Structures are given as structure tokens and as C-alpha cells.
């Protein structure tokens, strides 16, 4: 695992946040976009439409920017940078994830795993999903 180089252990700003989840049958991208003091959380599913991969909005919700920062800092998402959860050799399939984020103006967080997740991953994913509602 890569050494975490962030001196400040809290996220103060979010410039980019995409948490991708891949299973055998589904690819989801949970994206957080900041607009002033509001945060829009969107969940997209990759679907093939007319033989072309398209990013289709399936869930969306809005909360305060402060609430998103609380979630990410509570579960120490900044410490996930460099996480690489290699797939267990005796597991046939499972769930893979990738986090790509830019925070605190220019700090990149990149984490990836397959059936092995950083501490707090499931709680962050659940908290983000609870903000969203299905889009018709």
C-alpha cells in the first residue's frame, strides 16, 4: 500500500468524486457534484443502448455540502488514497470498486479493490445511497 502523503487528515473541498462499483452484471458510478453550498449525489448505471455504452442516471438526491464533508471525514476517506485490495485467490467473482477523487483543491485520492475494501467503504456507500431516490 502506498504511503499516505496528506498532512491534513480532513477533506475541506471536493472538486471531483466518483465511486465506481463493478459486479458481474452491473457497472455503477456514484458521483458527487458541488454547487455552492449544495451537493448533488447521482448514481449512474452503464447500459448498452443500440450497441453503445451509455451512462444512464438511475438515482439522484441533494444534500448540503457540509453533510457530504461530514460523511467523507467520518469514515476517513482521505486515508483511502493508495488502497489496493487485491482479489482473494479462492473467490470466483465478486464486487470491484474504484474511487477517483480530487479534494482540497489538488489532492488526488485513488483507491481500488476487488472483494477487499478500505475501512468505512460500505458505510460511505450506504450513506450516499440514502441521499438518493430513484429517477423515473
Show the residue positions of the predicted features.
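Short, well-ordered, aromatic-rich surface patches in folded extracellular/luminal domains
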Residues: 1-24, 29, 56-67, 71, ...
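Short, flexible N-terminal segments of the mature chain
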Residues: 29-49
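Short, cysteine-centered beta-strand-loop-beta hairpins and adjacent loop/turn segments enriched
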Residues: 49-51, 106
